[in-house]
A protein has these predicted regions:
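Bacterial N-terminal signal peptides that target proteins for export
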Residues: 1-8
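Solvent-exposed, well-ordered amphipathic alpha-helical segments
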Residues: 2, 40-44, 122
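Intrinsically disordered, low-complexity segments enriched in glycine/proline and serine/threonine
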Residues: 8-9, 80
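C-terminal motif of bacterial Sec signal peptides marking the signal peptidase cleavage site
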Residues: 16-20
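Bacterial signal peptide processing site
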Residues: 22-25
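Post-signal peptide N-terminal segment of mature Sec-exported envelope proteins
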Residues: 29-48
């Protein structure tokens, strides 16, 4: 019985380690997309001076990674008095990230299964 307990504990620990590391694979890409979106949101807020959220905050956004890290989609509410969610896609080529301006981010999100997702939006 003692050997069985050790085996179950070992399997449980390995499972936790494997699931805990799944986001680590995309951490760099997510961080780059978040930094770019922070800059983008700050510019939008300065330019429009309306009800735009002043800063992008990762903890208020949903993050989706697709195609083995090729695309990172950030979904959040950029307007303080509006519940509409906006989707922003960053494409990665090598280590470089670029915002995809004329890309149907919401459609892509709806039609594809993410490799990784982090849903923080309230």
């Amino acid at each position: 019985m003692n050997i069985l307990k050790k085996f179950v504990v070992m399997i449980s620990v390995l499972t936790l380690v494997l699931f805990g590391c799944s986001s680590g694979k995309y951490t760099d890409k997510i961080d780059k997309a978040v930094k770019l979106q922070e800059k983008k949101q700050t510019k939008i807020a300065k330019r429009d001076a309306g009800d735009e959220v002043k800063h992008f905050d990762k903890k208020d956004a949903n993050i989706y990674v697709y195609d083995k890290g090729k695309y990172v989609i950030l979904a959040y509410k950029p307007l303080s008095d509006d519940e509409e969610v906006h989707y922003y896609t960053y494409e990665f080529k090598g280590k470089k990230a670029k915002y995809k301006e004329n890309f149907n981010s919401k459609g892509y999100y709806q039609e594809h299964d993410p490799d990784y997702k982090e849903e923080n939006m309230r």
